[in-house]
Each structure stands twice: as structure tokens, then as C-alpha cells.
């Protein structure tokens, strides 16, 4: 009888021990906020291997891992019902999280999302060959660049979603994004290089010199000055906040009049090209 009770006690002790190790709660852990609105639970005590236990729930999936540090950094892993593997990597300074989904082999990427502390993020989706097919870059201010139909050479379709309207264009193999707006004979092109540098150009197919528009880009002020027959008519400023403002020149084309007005619709941008 004593042996029986001893056996039962040992089993219960092992179960309790397993529960303590496998599950974290508010009593035995600390919650740490991560970029992207995620949270990770960090055990208050080290395990038998001298590691801190980590737990997080992302998209209703429970992820677990261990870390040498108790600040929330480390790597957590899990498995979805379709056997695909999930990995969450938290930077040592908690400034960045990398959330990856792999196929069942644990090597072929399905998707990857990197989120920074300023709420900006880059999300990539991959095709069956493990090549990038879609990419979305969200800036800290909420505006974003969306890339779809990405081919093996890196080219594809592009879209910039601003605060109030959207610009569409293409992604070149060299990483250059070109977004275009057409109004009559005038084409406005916003170019975003792989480095993030922005340039803006204006082309007019009008053959009449007296009405033909030209544009001059000033990278220092991010301003496109539009002229007609060599006389300045208006300035378009592409601000750091990813907004566009327009301000007209006087009839002589020498001084700016009034105040710069923010463009809030695609129609207003097209009107500025008239």
C-alpha cells in the first residue's frame, strides 16, 4: 500500500513539475511588450539548463522557446495544424521582431514579417519555389508600399498607399519603384530607389512650346517646380511625412503666392498637373 501511494505521489509530482515548466502565467512570469503589439511571457526563474522560458501567442498559435536573458529576447517556435513551422525571433534590445512561417520541412519560407519599434514593418510572401512573390513595406506613419506579381528577376507591380489616395506603378529588377500619374499630355513620375532616395520627374508630350510643361526636381527641398514656356507656375513638395503639397507662383512666375496646400485626392494631384 505504501509503495502504491508513493507511486501515485511521484506521478502527481511529475505532472505538477511538467505543468510548471510547460506553462507560464502571471505568477511565474513577466509580460514584456514587443514591436507589432505582441507580448512575450518570460519565466521569473531559470530552468534546469540555466535558461529562461519564453511563451507567446501569435495569431492564436502558441510559441515556446528559451533564452539566456530575462528581458524577453530570444527565439520561439511552434507548429501549425498543417505541419508548417513557425519561428519568432526577438532582438536582444527588443527593437525588432522577425516572424517567419516555413513549410513542413522547416527550411522553405512561406512568409516573413519584420517589425520595428517605431511600428514600421516589412512583410514578404514566397511562392512554391521559395522566391518572393509579394512584399509590403509599412512606414512608421502608416503609409505603405505594396509589391505584387514579383517575378524571379525581382520586377513586378507597385502601389504606394498614402494617407488619402494611392499611386500605382512598377517595380524594376534593380529595386527601383516608379509610380506614375497622367493628366492629358503630362506624366508625373515618382521614383523610389532601392536605397530609399526619392526623385520626381515631369514629362510633357505637348509639341506646342507655349503650353508645354517642364519640371525641375530639387532633392534638397524635395520640390518639383513646374514651368510653362520657361515660366514657373507652381511647386509640388513631397514631404517627409509622405504627403504632397502644392503652391502657385504669381503671374510673373517669380514669387510664390499664398500658402502651400496639402493634396488629399488623386483628382487634386491631377488638377495640379494641368
From Swiss-Prot:
Lineage of the species this protein comes from: Bacteria, Pseudomonadati, Spirochaetota, Spirochaetia, Spirochaetales
Name of the molecule in the record: Outer surface protein A
Organism: Borreliella burgdorferi
The organism's place on the tree of life at top rank: Bacteria
Bilayer topology annotation: Lipid-anchor
Location of this chain's protein in the cell: Cell outer membrane; Cell surface
Positions of S-diacylglycerol cysteine lipidation: 17
Keywords, in A-Z order: Cell outer membrane, Lipoprotein, Membrane, Palmitate, Plasmid, Signal
Entry-linked PROSITE patterns: PROKAR_LIPOPROTEIN
Gene Ontology CC terms: cell outer membrane; cell surface
Family that this chain belongs to: Belongs to the OspA lipoprotein family.
Lipidation (N-palmitoyl cysteine): 17
Signal peptide: 1-16
Keyword Lipoprotein: yes
Pfam families assigned to the protein according to its UniProt record, in alphabetical order: Lipoprotein_1
